[in-house]
A protein has these predicted regions:
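Exposed alpha-helical structural elements
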Residues: 11, 18, 30, 55, ...
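A beta-strand edge to alpha-helix "cap/lid" segment located at domain peripheries
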Residues: 2-7, 58-140
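A solvent-exposed, acidic/Ser-Thr-rich amphipathic alpha-helical stretch
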Residues: 28-30, 34-81
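Short, low-complexity N-terminal intrinsically disordered segments enriched in polar/charged residues
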Residues: 1-33, 37, 135-140
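Short, mixed-charge, low-aromatic patches
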Residues: 10-20, 43-44, 56-60, 86-88
């Protein structure tokens, strides 16, 4: 992904750079340091959000293992520099997908809300099935 300056708050910019590093290395071991204790994950396959940093870390650490060829393409920021939208593509088995991560940060640069949207529906269903199998098997 090309670097494009975004109007981000300094703490958010540092956290976003660390997020991109972790994704590029497919190693989310340091994720907990980026999460607010009350962070919330909003899944594209579940109606109810998943509250708490441990739930967010567990979901993101598992989904990065399910996605193949995960790549970010474009990124956008809110005017206040506290929110980003990251467009991505990936595969789950034979299904190609496109999606966006909508991430809200606090003043310390910690993630407080992480929402994911994915299309098409067939790829989302494949992701839900793959995540279900992984979590049933113990996940991380």
């Amino acid at each position: 992904m090309k670097d494009h300056p975004l109007p981000l708050a300094p703490a958010v910019a540092a956290s976003l750079a660390e997020w991109h590093r972790m994704i590029a290395e497919r190693d989310l071991a340091a994720l907990s340091a980026l999460l607010h204790p009350d962070a919330v994950f909003r899944s594209p396959v579940a109606h109810k959000p998943y509250p708490g940093a441990s739930a967010v870390a567990m979901i993101l650490s598992n989904v990065i293992e399910v996605f193949e060829g995960f790549t970010y393409h474009r990124q956008f920021a809110s005017a206040d520099g506290m929110n980003v939208v990251l467009e991505f593509s990936a595969r789950v088995g034979e299904r190609e997908l496109k999606g966006v991560d909508l991430i809200r940060f606090d003043e310390q640069g910690r993630i407080v809300d992480f929402e994911v949207m994915i299309r098409p529906a067939s790829a989302l269903a494949a992701l839900g099935e793959a995540m279900g199998r992984r979590l049933a098997a113990g996940g991380r």
